[in-house]
A protein has these predicted regions:
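Substrate-binding pocket helix/loop in short-chain dehydrogenase/reductase
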Residues: 98-99, 103-111, 193, 204
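Active-site helix of classical SDR
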Residues: 122, 158, 166
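Residue(s) in the substrate-gating loop at a strand-loop-helix junction
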Residues: 142
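Short, small/polar-rich loop/turn modules that mediate ligand/substrate recognition or access, typified
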Residues: 174, 179, 215, 234-236
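Alpha-helical segment proximal to the catalytic Tyr-Lys
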Residues: 127, 171-175, 232
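The beta1-alpha1 cofactor-binding region of Rossmann-like NAD(H)/NADP(H)-dependent oxidoreductases
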Residues: 40-41, 61-73, 104, 217-218
Length: 247
């Protein structure tokens, strides 16, 4: 039930970190993967990992915040692969700061990538999914979109918006057998968290009932579930992958 044989998955922000882990996980389940990011060098690394699993991988320099770039990218993917069965909207950025000091540019930059990007990619890919009367859209949100966080007004607003947008898309597309769900990760281990002082890491872990950072694979496993037929009766939901931070 967790197989994606003969499926084509489009993953944004696929060059490294969580996006790379998701792309590899979907390939492990049998999917061919269209990899989207602006970092061509790191994107090729992800492509190599997918190809090593025996599956097709193609790279696309898509700027998710630009409508023309997204439209061209989706058209190219549909031409190259013939279809898109799974869309994972993972691309995201942060520009943290207290709201009192946050510039309008920093607000716009985060909302443009994190929220507008999900809107643009979903809008571009949904037409083909509706026509084939099947598809799974998985949007990467965050527990910050559920609980808020000081110093992250732009990020919290963008991820809260992703959650609301996911529910709306689920309602609009369910009659065409296209599902849309969101994943809300908590603190996930990255090179950035690894570089933090041990005391800082310990304080962060105190907020997590499971007392550890999540691994990228923890999130990728949930994405695979939502992308596969194992979740055929699941739509409009938010699955928190946060070690119990949000209950």
């Amino acid at each position: 039930m967790f197989e994606l044989n003969d499926k084509v998955a489009m993953v944004t922000g696929a060059a490294r970190g969580l996006g790379q882990a998701i792309a590899v996980k979907l390939a492990e389940a049998g999917a061919d993967v269209a990899l989207c990011d602006l970092n061509a060098e790191w994107l090729e690394e992800t492509a190599g990992k997918v190809k090593a699993l025996g599956h097709r991988a193609e790279c696309y320099g898509v700027n998710v915040a630009d409508g023309a770039s997204v439209t061209a990218g989706v058209k190219a993917i549909e031409k190259d692969f013939g279809k898109i069965d799974v869309l994972v909207n993972n691309a995201g950025i942060t520009k943290d700061g207290l709201m009192m000091r946050m510039s309008e540019d920093d607000w716009d930059a985060v909302l443009n990538v994190n929220l507008k990007g999900v809107f643009l990619c979903t809008k571009a890919a949904m037409r083909g999914m509706m026509k084939q009367r099947s598809g799974a859209i998985v949007n990467i949100a965050s527990v910050i979109g559920l609980m808020g966080n000081a110093g992250q007004a732009n990020y919290a607003a963008s991820k809260g918006g992703v959650i609301a947008l996911s529910k709306t898309v689920a309602k609009e597309l369910s009659s065409r057998n296209v599902r849309c769900n969101a994943v809300a990760p908590g603190f996930i281990r990255t090179a950035m968290t690894d570089a933090l002082d041990e005391e800082v890491q310990s304080k962060m872990k105190e907020l997590i009932p499971l007392a550890r950072f999540g691994e990228p694979e923890d999130v990728a496993n949930v994405v695979l579930f939502l992308a596969s037929d194992a979740s055929a009766y699941v739509t409009g939901q938010v699955l928190s992958t946060c070690g119990g931070m949000v209950m």
